[in-house]
Design a protein with these regions (language model features):
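Primarily membrane-embedded glycan-assembly and transfer machineries that use lipid-linked glycans
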Residues: 1-181, 206-324, 337-339, 385-389, ...
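Active/binding-pocket-proximal capping segment
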Residues: 328-333
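Aromatic-enriched
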Residues: 335-339, 343-445, 451, 455-462
Length: 462
């Protein structure tokens, strides 16, 4: 077990100060310099303002040009429940609301970094510079690395809802589901934004019928709340706006990292695009389900969440790169679990290809497809420019990410992995006095160990 001194070394304090400075300077840049800083948060806030016509804002919630900024005409794309959740911001000054979003984003990044730190510690791996930074300093430095990666950088810029979605999903899986069944927080996340419902696949693989029922009931409750409190807007969303893909944006934009997005970036369209998407989507669900089962046998909850997050952005028709806020957790899972436990059983050539794809995905998505596409000074939207280097190359990291996870899933089919000894989760060795350390650490032990042993007993008696 790797241990660090309780006192934070000077370099760790410098890392903490650097993180605080980055957050403060980032906030000032967004409100004072960047004309589009907090753009998405402004849309959330205006959506909430329509409920009581705050500040004289009287537009319909699902009007096509809900917010107009220059040539941009942006709609409100979320369920009515999301507008209700953001209602408190309608009564706060815009700058105060942005400050809360920035602090919330930084807090979510810190928590994710804490989980990744605990993940590495439980795996017996030390993070770079951990010895000279100390525990808190290492988490601060890791938070900086997380917030500078493509998805989080763009999320910070737009003040997006994705860190909240991530926090709800992660919390539901790493908390002790003793009094409140698992699935409640995922259902709430689905009420804010539909795509998190795909995390129900983990519950399905676990045969957690209570969790699935709880998820479904919670999600339906969010819909009911929308119909009760917003009786005019709810039918507009559920019977009209939800089926209009043009409201989300241009599906061919280089920042679309979904399967459908990178297929278009590589030149497919029309029937070939549809057939390719449906085939790869079906393959993805099947292989990820197999991988989730093998991860379940080993109690690898964090890897399950990371893999399913990748499936979520792959299946959605449009997934902007900033939707992929679980990317840091997936990269950690690849390093700590995928390659040392699973990929090692692949043939040498396949293992090298998977490693190369993982590097391309990690580096490319850390930079972000938008930046890569912009470097070439070429058009990033029009269909006629599909084979322009900026679009094709910008789309390759998202393909590489998907392909890496598929390699991982195929590796989980190998006989040595399938026949490996089932062992309980090892997060219990993480220090219990860590900030929020029981989330993703000690609280998982008894529940997850019991689940693993139960599954092992079923297999032995089958």
């Amino acid at each position: 077990m790797i241990r660090t001194e309780s006192a934070t070394p000077i370099w760790g304090k410098i890392a903490i100060a650097a993180l605080i400075l980055m957050v403060v300077c980032g906030y000032l840049f967004e409100i004072l310099i960047n004309p589009f800083g907090g753009l998405d948060f402004s849309i959330y806030r205006m959506g909430a303002m329509t409920i009581f016509d705050n500040e004289g804002f009287t537009k319909d919630l699902y009007a096509p040009a809900f917010v107009e900024i220059g040539v941009l005409k942006l709609p409100f794309t979320y369920p009515p429940f999301a507008a209700l959740v953001f209602l408190p911001f309608a009564f706060l000054p815009l700058e105060v609301g942005k400050a809360i979003m920035v602090l919330g984003t930084a807090a979510a990044a810190w928590w994710l970094s804490t989980i990744i730190y605990n993940y590495a510690q439980a795996s017996g791996r030390a993070l770079p510079l951990q010895g000279c930074l100390g525990r808190t300093g290492t988490i601060a430095a890791l938070t900086i690395v997380v917030m500078l990666c493509g998805p989080w950088r763009r999320t910070f810029d737009l003040m997006q809802i994705n860190p909240l979605i991530m926090a709800l999903v992660l919390a539901d899986f790493v908390r002790p589901a003793t009094r409140v069944p698992r699935g409640v927080l995922i259902g709430i996340a689905g009420g804010l934004k539909l795509t998190p419902l795909v995390f129900g696949l983990i519950l399905l693989v676990r045969r957690d019928w209570k969790g699935i029922a709880t998820l479904g009931a919670t999600f339906l409750t969010t819909i009911a709340v929308g119909f009760i409190l917003l009786p005019n807007e709810a039918p507009q969303f559920w019977f009209s706006a939800i089926s209009d893909p043009s409201r989300v944006g241009d599906i061919n934009f280089v920042d679309n990292i979904s399967i459908q997005g990178w297929l278009m970036h590589f030149g497919l369209n029309g029937t070939a695009l549809k057939l390719g998407f449906y085939a790869l989507a079906a393959l993805s669900v099947a292989l990820v389900a197999v991988l989730l089962y093998q991860l379940e046998r080993r109690g690898k909850t964090l890897a399950q969440v990371a893999v399913t997050g990748t499936l979520m952005v792959a299946l959605s028709p449009i997934s902007w790169s900033h939707h992929n806020v679980l990317l840091p957790l997936l990269l950690a899972a690849l390093i700590l679990d995928a390659f040392p436990t699973f990929m090692v059983h692949l043939p040498s050539a396949a293992r090298k290809i998977a490693c190369l794809l993982a590097w391309v995905a990690g580096v490319g998505l850390y930079i972000s497809p938008r930046i890569i596409g912009g470097i070439t000074q070429l058009d990033m939207n029009g269909l006629e420019f599909l084979w322009a280097p900026g679009v094709a190359i910008g789309g390759f990291p998202s393909f590489a990410l998907w392909a890496t996870v598929m390699f991982w899933a195929v590796a989980s089919l190998s006989a040595p992995v399938r026949g490996a000894k089932v062992e309980p989760v090892q997060y219990g060795s993480v220090r219990s006095d860590a900030p929020l350390g029981w989330w993703g650490a000690r609280a998982l032990v008894t529940e997850r160990t019991e689940s693993v042993h139960t599954d092992a007993s079923r297999e032995a008696t089958a």
